[in-house]
């Protein structure tokens, strides 16, 4: 294989190859490759591929490993997006509390016989959701919500495999640089943390409340933590993937570009915060409190914004305040994206960067339309799930534009 890929060393003895075969390595400042001996067939870091010959080491810069790792992380971010969307549908169909225990391996086999299904249904009947909300549920209806939660859990395990197995392979092959190894370890650790956090969230909905008539639901705080960590995992994977796959633009570091870059970062943070506030809306069913727009009922600012004491509790526990906050954050986000778009038009930017700005603007107004429609139609499941998927698409657009504007290290 080495003979096919590279000419024999005798053929390299010509005048034009003398610098390559010189006994002393070129200074590091004058070449982009690093010379060091490797085992035959082993790749070095993601920025080089080296082959060892009998008379020395020949290192050639290569982007092949970068592309492989970048595509892998792009697939990883896609699986995380699928988990977020499936989790949202599970929440909207009120299926999240149907599986009342958690086992990493044992629960991967679903019930198959009538006796197993009856036993599973009897376990569910011991918890508040059945006693208060679903006391007239049939076994057929229970199977539907059980399979919804089962699908979400199995998808989560798939996400873990998609991260961990290729990461181990790339590590063994030596395709990860030192910095990339740290990132990959952090991503894999966050995946494992996500699984534990998901069960911690579900447990909050299985506990008996102090008031026996309280509607069984998971803690909105734990739901927001579960969604937030998933979004962090998605953003980190997607950002790293884009950085590896998309060649950076060498833009002139002007004052206008610096302002645009900072504004893009702030806008992306605002989009993230708006998506996170949606977890509180879902956790408290706040989308059903006021189903009118732009006013909330008959007024712009409803009277029941500050019904809880202390006042700070209203931000996270009062459904009216939670919906109000989500509206304000959504309007602020689309306004910031609009301003960002017009700022980008004042600077000569590459075509791909302009496309990212236009895409982000289109996604923003589509998401606003979906949100208003979901509100006015009393949160139908298909539309609400599309709205949640739109938040991921909008966050993706913001990350893409940020990546296009990133500073190129000198």
Swiss-Prot record:
Pathway: Porphyrin-containing compound metabolism; heme A biosynthesis; heme A from heme O: step 1/1. GO terms for cellular component: cytochrome complex; mitochondrial inner membrane; mitochondrion; nucleoplasm; respiratory chain complex. Residues 1-67, 172-183, 248-268, 345-356, 403-410 are mitochondrial matrix. It is a multi-pass membrane protein. Keywords: Disease variant, Heme biosynthesis, Iron, Leigh syndrome, Membrane, Metal-binding, Mitochondrion, Mitochondrion inner membrane, Oxidoreductase, Primary mitochondrial disease, Transmembrane, Transmembrane helix. The chain crosses the membrane at residues 68-88, 154-171, 184-204, 227-247, 269-289, 324-344, 357-377, 382-402. Heme o binds at residues 152, 226. This is Heme A synthase COX15. The gene is COX15.
């Amino acid at each position: 294989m080495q003979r096919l890929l590279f000419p024999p060393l005798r053929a390299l003895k010509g005048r034009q190859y003398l610098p390559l075969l010189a006994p002393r390595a070129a200074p590091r400042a004058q070449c982009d490759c690093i010379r060091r001996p490797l085992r035959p067939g082993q790749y070095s870091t993601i920025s080089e591929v080296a082959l060892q010959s009998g008379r020395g080491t020949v290192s050639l810069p290569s982007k092949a490993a970068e592309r492989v790792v970048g595509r892998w992380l792009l697939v990883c971010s896609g699986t995380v997006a699928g988990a977020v969307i499936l989790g949202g549908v599970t929440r909207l169909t009120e299926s999240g509390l149907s599986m009342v225990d958690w086992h990493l391996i044992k629960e991967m086999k679903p019930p198959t016989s009538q006796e197993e299904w009856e036993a599973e249904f009897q376990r569910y009947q011991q918890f508040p959701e059945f006693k208060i909300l679903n006391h007239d549920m049939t076994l057929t209806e229970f199977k539907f919500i059980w399979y919804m939660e089962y699908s979400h859990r199995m998808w989560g395990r798939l996400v873990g495999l998609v991260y961990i197995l290729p990461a181990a392979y790339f590590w063994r092959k030596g395709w990860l640089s030192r910095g990339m190894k740290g990132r990959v370890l952090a991503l894999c650790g966050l995946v494992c943390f996500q699984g534990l956090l998901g069960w911690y969230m579900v447990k909050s909905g299985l506990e008996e409340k102090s008031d026996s008539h309280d509607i069984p639901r998971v803690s909105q705080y734990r739901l927001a933590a579960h969604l937030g960590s998933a979004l962090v995992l998605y953003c980190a994977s997607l950002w790293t993937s884009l950085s590896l796959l998309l060649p950076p633009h060498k833009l002139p570091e002007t004052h206008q570009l610096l302002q645009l870059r900072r504004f893009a970062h702030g806008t992306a943070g605002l989009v993230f915060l708006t998506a996170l506030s949606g977890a509180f809306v879902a956790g408290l069913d706040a989308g059903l409190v006021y189903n009118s727009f732009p006013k909330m009922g008959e007024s712009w600012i409803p009277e029941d914004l500050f019904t809880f004491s202390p006042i700070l509790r209203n931000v996270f526990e009062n459904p009216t305040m939670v919906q109000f906050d989500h509206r304000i954050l959504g309007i602020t986000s689309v306004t910031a994206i609009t301003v960002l778009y017009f700022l980008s038009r004042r600077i000569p930017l590459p075509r791909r960067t302009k496309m990212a700005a236009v895409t982000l603007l289109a996604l923003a107004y589509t998401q606003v339309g979906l949100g208003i429609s979901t509100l006015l139609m009393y949160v139908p499941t298909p539309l609400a799930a599309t709205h949640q998927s739109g938040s991921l698409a909008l966050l993706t657009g913001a990350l893409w534009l940020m990546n296009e504007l990133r500073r190129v290290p000198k």
